[in-house]
UniProtKB/Swiss-Prot annotation:
Domain of life from the UniProt record: Bacteria
Residues spanning the signal sequence: none
One GO molecular-function entry: structural constituent of ribosome
Pfam families, sorted: Ribosomal_S16
Protein name, UniProt field: Small ribosomal subunit protein bS16
Keywords recorded for this protein, A-Z: Ribonucleoprotein, Ribosomal protein
SUPFAM superfamilies named among the record's database cross-references: Ribosomal protein S16
Gene this protein is translated from: rpsP
Length: 135
């Protein structure tokens, strides 16, 4: 069985995102897969690329052939270099900057009240079970 590492297309028209999958080469593009090993969202800025490195290394070592696009993604993440023997291969994937945490304005009064836990009914429940067992 010839195994390929390729992209499985998901999403809407003109808004694609992909899963990096291991599948039989004869299977349909979006058909049955052996394993999902990553994600690729090309429409985000910068593109979101996530690959489970251990699983990619395993499948490459047992002979799975990556498609051209997946090979390019593996080169960006450094997995292709590690597979070819470069121990110093590093990921060159750019990541999005973290959003600053939201800080509520202390001058304004909060609209929503925080929930309070009702501890009293929960404490009464074990006592009720104990009285039923004695009866």
């Amino acid at each position: 069985m010839a195994v390929k590492i390729r992209l499985k297309r998901l999403g809407k028209i003109r808004a694609p995102y992909y899963r990096i999958v291991v599948a039989d080469s004869r299977a349909k593009r979006d058909g049955r897969v052996i394993e999902e090993i990553g994600k690729y969202h090309p429409t985000e800025e910068p593109s979101f690329i996530e690959v489970q490195s251990e699983r990619a290394q395993y499948w490459l070592s047992v002979g799975a052939q990556p498609t051209e696009q997946v090979e390019a993604l593996l080169k960006l993440t450094g997995d292709w270099g590690r597979f070819k023997g470069d121990k110093d291969a590093v990921s060159t994937v750019r990541t999005r900057e973290a959003k600053p945490a939201y800080v509520a304005d202390e001058k304004k009064k909060p609209v929503l009240k925080p929930k309070t836990e009702k501890a009293a009914p929960e404490a009464a429940a074990p006592e009720a079970e104990a009285t039923e067992e004695q009866a």
